[in-house]
């Protein structure tokens, strides 16, 4: 099969890496890709905003399945367009993607289908939102309604935080039109996990879970990011909790989509808070998480392309997913200044030495090849993944690999998976 992966992150690198291992894979393309992906796939660069460009490429290269990585292309209806032209796509329709692209749609869906989520109110008016925060108990959570690259959530410990959050989102338009509407919800106590399941027209299939570190700095300090690291498994997640997630959240979500005549084909990411009252849905994402994807795919034993092929043909029920029993830790190396302003084009050296450490696989994100060197070209730059018998050993291997890398322009968290080791 000929496969096209759309995207340029470490998530897409890990997807290409996984698909490449499949006996079913004849040729793999990635648009636009990065300096790491181009070593295992044919990378092309053309205007993805024009859907016809994607269609023409698919026809020219006889693409069997398109795998869409980033959420913005799902929001723009790339999946719908290609399917209407008889191209198979792994990734939900524009309508189904509203589970991520509109927090308001997602919260209403959860409420309609009696799936546990935090109590909430939504506002289009800055004045009404300001009046509301004067009457609530803190902490609270303020969320931009639309897509904000994983950074549109603000946890407010007091009224000053909330006023600043409202000003940034609704007045200063920090997230553009994504902040035209906001959600204000109660703060839930507990711990977060990212849970993943494949959905097709007829059934769903559990992939697994990972724990994500969203804050920029150690001890969960600093601003929210797209994710600075992840790990699996967690000593806090028992079989009982997993079953509760499947029965009270995943299945009702599948049933709700079916009831509302929304066909969902692809991976669905459940951002959950595990509280003393059980799991609550914080958010849905309609694609693989990053860095969770890198972590999960290191642990996946089943052929990913077999799963994707079955998924796009509504035959998930034919698949049995097998995961390894080892532990995986993923540490993200980001450009200094991320998630704010950062410099590009700093040279990264000694990656090949880091890759030699036992259990290590390095996935590229914001990297480019320049004058036969690897240089930084984005906020999150590398995902160092490590697989071992325990979290403790996997952590040790990951940080040993990072020490081998020579990059003065980057930073990373030193506590990924620490609480679980």
Where are these regions (language model features)?
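Active-site "cap" helix and flanking loop/linker of ATP-utilizing ligase/carboxylase catalytic domains
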Residues: 246-269, 285-357, 370
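Short, conserved charged micro-motifs
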Residues: 53, 161-164, 339-342, 389-396
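Short, charged, surface-exposed secondary-structure boundary motifs
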Residues: 38-41, 98-104, 217-219, 359
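Generic C-terminus detector
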Residues: 50, 367-371, 376-421
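Active-site nucleotide/adenylate-binding loops and adjacent lid/helix of ATP-dependent enzymes
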Residues: 4-5, 99-183, 211, 235-251
């Amino acid at each position: 099969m000929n496969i096209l992966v759309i995207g340029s992150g470490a998530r897409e690198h890990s997807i290409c890496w996984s698909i490449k291992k499949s006996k079913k894979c004849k040729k793999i393309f990635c648009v636009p890709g990065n300096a790491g992906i181009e070593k295992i796939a044919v990378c092309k660069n053309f205007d993805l905003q024009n859907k016809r460009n994607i269609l023409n490429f698919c026809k020219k290269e006889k693409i069997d399945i398109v795998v869409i990585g980033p959420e913005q292309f799902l929001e723009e209806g790339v999946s719908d367009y290609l399917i209407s032209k008889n191209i198979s796509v792994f990734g939900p329709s524009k309508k189904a993607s509203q589970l991520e692209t509109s927090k308001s749609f997602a919260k209403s869906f959860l409420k309609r289908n009696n799936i546990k989520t935090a109590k909430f109110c939504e506002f289009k008016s800055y004045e009404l939102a300001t009046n509301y925060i004067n009457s609530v108990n803190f902490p609270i959570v303020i969320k931009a309604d639309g897509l904000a690259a994983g950074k549109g959530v603000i946890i407010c410990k007091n009224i000053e935080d909330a006023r600043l959050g409202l000003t940034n989102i609704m007045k200063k338009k920090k997230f553009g039109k994504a902040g035209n509407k906001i959600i204000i919800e109660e703060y839930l106590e507990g711990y977060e996990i990212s849970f993943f399941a494949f959905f097709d027209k007829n059934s769903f299939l559990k992939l697994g879970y990972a724990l994500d570190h969203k804050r920029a700095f150690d001890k969960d300090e600093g601003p929210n990011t797209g994710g600075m690291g992840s790990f699996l498994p967690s000593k806090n997640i028992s079989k009982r909790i997993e079953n509760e997630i499947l029965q009270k959240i995943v299945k009702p979500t599948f049933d709700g989509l079916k009831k509302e005549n929304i066909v969902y084909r692809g991976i669905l990411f459940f951002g959950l808070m595990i509280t003393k009252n059980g799991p609550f849905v914080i958010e849905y994402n309609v694609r693989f998480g990053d860095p969770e994807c890198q972590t999960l795919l290191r642990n996946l034993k089943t052929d990913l392309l077999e799963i994707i092929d079955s998924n796009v043909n509504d035959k998930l029920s034919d698949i049995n997913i097998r995961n390894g029993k080892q532990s995986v830790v993923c540490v993200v190396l980001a450009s200094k200044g991320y998630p704010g302003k950062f410099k590009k084009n700093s040279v990264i050296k000694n990656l090949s030495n880091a890759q030699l450490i036992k259990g290590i696989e390095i996935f590229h994100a914001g990297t480019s090849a320049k004058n036969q060197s690897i240089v930084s070209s984005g906020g999150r730059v590398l995902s160092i993944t490590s697989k071992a018998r325990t979290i403790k050993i996997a952590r040790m291997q990951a940080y040993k690999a990072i020490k081998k890398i020579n990059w003065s322009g980057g930073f990373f968290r030193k506590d990924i998976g620490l609480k679980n080791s």
